[in-house]
Amino acid sequence: MQTQKGGRPTILPKMYEEPLFSQIIDKIESGCNDREIYTSLHCSAKTFRKWRDDNIKAYDEAKSIARGNLLELAESALASKLTVRTLKETETIYDADGNVEKVKVKEKELDKDSLVAMMVAKAGNPELYNPTEWRRLQQEESSAHDLKAKIEELDDYKLSKYKTPEIEVPEGFE
């Protein structure tokens, strides 16, 4: 470690060299945040920011890999909640001597998670699953239903249902 002018030794020069450089990048790719990294290196946040700013391209690439890994994990978790799954619970009862007395196995079938389904649908088509848009569509639907009811009510008054009376022309009226 090198000493700075009038201060304690710094690890910054070693951070630019192998193998420490690769180790830092690996930690970033694995999803560690900056604080976890500079704390494990026993350096200050300012020192780490200086290294990060000098190596911004490698840092950004590692962060994008970490985000991709996190997104994959989230997608697989969501996919598992979008399928019907069976959960097994095993309950073992022991006697006073520690011997197995009874084993109960319960199976629960967990249905698809509707909130997850809505979230995935919203991610696919945000305009359609926007709560404001959803309310507007419901109002349009209800007003269309009201309009349909009014039209059906007016159908009762169609002139075709009534017979026109035959009017005789009075004598001398032509």
UniProtKB/Swiss-Prot annotation:
Keywords: Viral genome packaging, Viral release from host cell. Pfam families: Phage_term_sma. Probable terminase small subunit. The terminase lies at a unique vertex of the procapsid and is composed of two subunits, a small terminase subunit and a large terminase subunit. Both terminase subunits heterooligomerize and are docked on the portal protein to form the packaging machine. Once the capsid is packaged with the DNA, the terminase complex is substituted by the connector proteins gp15. Belongs to the skunalikevirus terminase small subunit family. This is Terminase small subunit. It comes from Lactococcus phage p2. The lineage of its organism: Viruses, Duplodnaviria, Heunggongvirae, Uroviricota, Caudoviricetes.
